Design a protein with these regions (language model features):
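Tetratricopeptide repeat
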Residues: 5, 39-42, 75, 79-82, ...
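Eukaryotic all-alpha helical interaction scaffolds
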Residues: 46, 66, 86, 120, ...
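Short secondary-structure boundary elements
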Residues: 1-4, 8-12, 19, 23
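Alpha-helix C-terminal capping/termination sites
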Residues: 28, 35, 48, 68, ...
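The canonical alpha-helical register within tetratricopeptide repeats
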Residues: 8-11, 41, 48, 61, ...
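Short, well-ordered secondary-structure microsegments
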Residues: 2, 6, 26-100
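Tandem amphipathic alpha-helical repeat scaffolds
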Residues: 19, 56-69, 92-109, 122, ...
Length: 168
């Protein structure tokens, strides 16, 4: 693995993330499955060579795929490793915390999911990053929905108000 290969695989992961939400999702899941070992090697190379932001981006881009294919534990390991590395981009960190919280929730680790989403929300609010604020609020809402419908509704409504206030 070298930098050129790692960056090409990061670009592939970016394209795959977009395509997983479209009509060719099954085709792209298969492509990701076939290249999983290469993607894991690229993630390790990026992290090991100080490209922590790119490693976090890759882990975040692949989190949904890993969740959908029953590999949430792998996604959490990748995100934990990226979060443990020194990150200079707080926005990427806020997104990584959200993604990790989502995977924790899927694993039934509700307390950890709430903590991760809460940390994401705190950081996103500090940055004024409205899209990530809305994501973190939705993540919290999904977790607390199991226990407190009114609180989940309030979080969801706040997320909607936040999204309405963005240009995205």
């Amino acid at each position: 693995m070298d930098e050129r290969e790692a960056r090409a695989l990061l670009s592939f992961a970016e394209e795959a993330r977009r395509k997983l939400a479209g009509p060719d999702a099954g085709v792209w899941r298969d492509r990701l499955e076939r290249r999983h070992q290469e993607l894991e090697a690229a993630f390790g190379w990026l992290l090991g060579h100080g490209h922590t932001g790119d490693a976090q981006r890759m882990a975040g881009l692949l989190a949904e795929f890993l969740r959908l294919t029953g590999q949430a534990a792998t996604g959490r390991v990748w995100l934990d490793r990226a979060l443990a590395a020194a990150m200079v981009d707080d926005r990427l960190k806020a997104v990584a915390l959200y993604e990790n919280g989502t995977l924790a929730s899927w694993q039934g680790a509700d307390e950890e999911a709430c903590s991760l989403h809460g940390r994401s929300l705190h950081l996103a609010r500090r940055l004024g990053d409205k899209p990530t604020i809305a994501l973190a609020l939705c993540g919290l809402a999904r977790v607390v929905l199991r226990e407190d419908l009114e609180w989940a509704r309030a979080l969801g409504e706040e997320a909607l108000r936040t999204v309405d206030a963005t240009d995205d």
